[in-house]
Amino acid sequence: MIEVSGVWKIFGVEPEAALKAINEHNLGKAEVLEQFNAVVGVADVNLSINRGEIFCIMGLSGSGKSTLVRHFNRLLEPTAGSISIEGTDVMKLGQTQLREFRNRKIGMVFQNFALLPHRSVLDNVAMPLEIRQVSKNDRMRQAAKILD
């Protein structure tokens, strides 16, 4: 069984502050972007998927489907919430345990493994660092070094 409870993902420099403002002042996505320069990728998702159940996550392009699923194996870390898979609290796993969990309990096939055409080669190479929230200067320096 997969259980997801209260999962949020906010992309930006201060995601926790943005989430606090959302909860305290009922801010919408546009207000979060304007006030915190942050993007709400996943907003308060709750779901349970039983073993063997066929479960469909549907939505428009860019609505957060893949972002949500990437939390199941912690390719993305949620800003808030909990995720449990077959009784294992995924959020409490250390790096070694997480690798073992990914190897034995969960897999993922990416929907698109090509370069992103709207990004430069440098930006494509730097993207994994962006996801890890490395500063722009550091990720550009590291990506340029790799490409050199």
Give a label for each model feature:
Residues 73:
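Helix-to-loop junction immediately C-terminal to a conserved catalytic motif
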Residues 119-126:
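Short coil-to-helix segment of the ABC ATPase nucleotide-binding domain corresponding to the Q-loop/switch region
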Residues 20-31, 86-89, 130-133, 137-148:
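Conserved ABC ATPase "signature" region
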Residues 32-37, 90-106, 131, 136-140:
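ABC ATPase NBD coupling module
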